[in-house]
């Protein structure tokens, strides 16, 4: 009897850059991805944490050019290249229940069909998207209303939609690179900023803030991409392995990010006991929700029929997650 043995493909070194440290959520995801690739092939995956290859915009350009094989990028940064990606930044659209969040990110047609095509047009192979936790707002002073945010300079990513969001919320949106947030808070160049809980803890942003407020407006979302030419020129075996590693890492991180958020809240409170946590009530959130409708209109205005269709599909996906 003749035996057929699958010979290993040529060993390659794959470069993977993230927007965070290796101990943050993107780093944990990338490390899990790397482990699966290296255990099941002769390939090596080199991880580049935040700061080693430049800012987020630099990483994206390097991925498009093929200098990186993989990259993580949030819609807040890629939205300037793919305006429709900002749909994930729309306030009060994504769910708060964990079961709905998990189902949505695993089964969304918006992610796995529509955006796969849009990212492909930019020389990027969209592998997956995953949540990094609830976004909270750090400030020096307490606010419970839009009036409380009035005149406050709040740092946001360089997304036109985030800028519109904080204008609608009554604040003064101030785009800054990630690496400048701490210093800007410290010198009162800005009076606040938004980020997921794990990042508030790891970047120690609570040290230069007195209040952390949840208004329930969004989840921080990240996309994992490969350079399209690299992916399409890979063997079928390598593509299957990338898909397997992507799915396993995504399944893991969806649960992990929830646990890390709880841990981050405890760590911050232990490190700075006098920091004040505030969660707005439904009644307090309502004016923010009403203002969010204007932001949806701005999104459609900026993205046209494509954005309108994507928002419609996204809401259908979310409805499926809620009623499954």
Segments from the language model and where they lie:
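Signature of the catalytic double-stranded beta-helix
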Residues: 104-115
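Sec-dependent N-terminal signal peptides
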Residues: 1-3
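N-terminal secretory/targeting leader peptides
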Residues: 11-101, 115-324
